[in-house]
Amino acid sequence: MRTDAQTEAALLHILECFCSRFAARDADGVMELFAPDADVVMVTSEEALLRGTDEVRAFLRRYVQRPTTYSWTWDRRGVSAAGTVGWLLAEGTEGVAQADHEEKHPYRMSMVCEKRCGRWLLLQVHGSSPHHE
C-alpha cells in the first residue's frame, strides 16, 4: 500500500537516522528510535536474533566497543503504510570498515514501525546480505 508523502518522509527519516546513528556508533541514539516494548526485534548479520530492548541495547553497546564500523548507501527504498503501521525495504550497499581495510557488499534492510502519540517508532529491523551463486 502506497502512503502519503508525509508518512513516506517520516519513515525514510527513521531509516536515515538509524543508519547514520549506527555508523556514528551512537548506541543511545539508535535506541531512541525503538519502541520501548519487550517484543521489539532486530536481526543483524552478526547476531541471529535480538529480542527486546535489553538485547538490542546490549548488542549496540558491544558494537560501539569493537573496531568495525558499518554504514549503508541505498539505491532503492520502498515505503508502505496502513493506519498507524508502516514498513519499508531498502536495497543497496553495506560498508564494513576496519582500521586497515573496507569491504562493500549488497545489503537489504527492512523495518516495521508504528506511529504512537504522533511519533514513528521502530518495532522490527531486519538486515541481510543476499548471496549470489
Specify the residue positions occupied by each region the protein language model found.
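Residue-level preference for beta-strand/loop junctions
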Residues: 70-71, 84, 88, 105-107
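Short, cysteine-centered beta-strand-loop-beta hairpins and adjacent loop/turn segments enriched
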Residues: 95-103
